[in-house]
Amino acid sequence: MSMTDPIADMLTRIRNAGMAKHQKVDIPSSNLKVSLANLLRNEGFIKNYKVIADNKQGVLRVYLKYIDEKDPVINEIKRISKPGGRVYVDSDGIPKVKNGLGVAVLSTSKGIITDKTARELGVGGELLCTVW
């Protein structure tokens, strides 16, 4: 079955696994998803991730992070730019998520970066999702 929005699928799997208190979640892998998982790890939203080869596209295993072993660190993870309605922002139009407590994730010419990094570099791009 073809998937129209693999990033939304990844975010939904992470959100559902967090609500179900799972320690890890397996997601079909791609370069974009690995970049997004790397950014989430660097920002402290997930413990870690690893790519497992399975002679097809591979599996991205994401290890979730919890506060006091019960509440997920990710309170909300939301897809912004969708296949049916892409959302592009310039460096001046990058939104602050929860007054700077959260992170907006952008796909730019410099790669997958956070809103803070995009402002520092003065670049805009496609607003993939917000996390807090």
Swiss-Prot record:
Keywords, in A-Z order: Ribonucleoprotein, Ribosomal protein, RNA-binding, rRNA-binding
InterPro entries, per the entry: Ribosomal_uS8, Ribosomal_uS8_CS, Ribosomal_uS8_sf
GO molecular function, one term: structural constituent of ribosome
Entries under SUPFAM superfamilies matching the protein: Ribosomal protein S8
Domain of life: Bacteria
Biological process, per Gene Ontology: translation
GO cellular component: ribonucleoprotein complex; ribosome
Quaternary context: Part of the 30S ribosomal subunit. Contacts proteins S5 and S12.
Family membership: Belongs to the universal ribosomal protein uS8 family.
Function of the protein: One of the primary rRNA binding proteins, it binds directly to 16S rRNA central domain where it helps coordinate assembly of the platform of the 30S subunit.
Protein name per UniProt: Small ribosomal subunit protein uS8
Organism encoding this protein: Geotalea uraniireducens (strain Rf4) (Geobacter uraniireducens)
Native organism taxonomy: Bacteria, Pseudomonadati, Thermodesulfobacteriota, Desulfuromonadia, Geobacterales
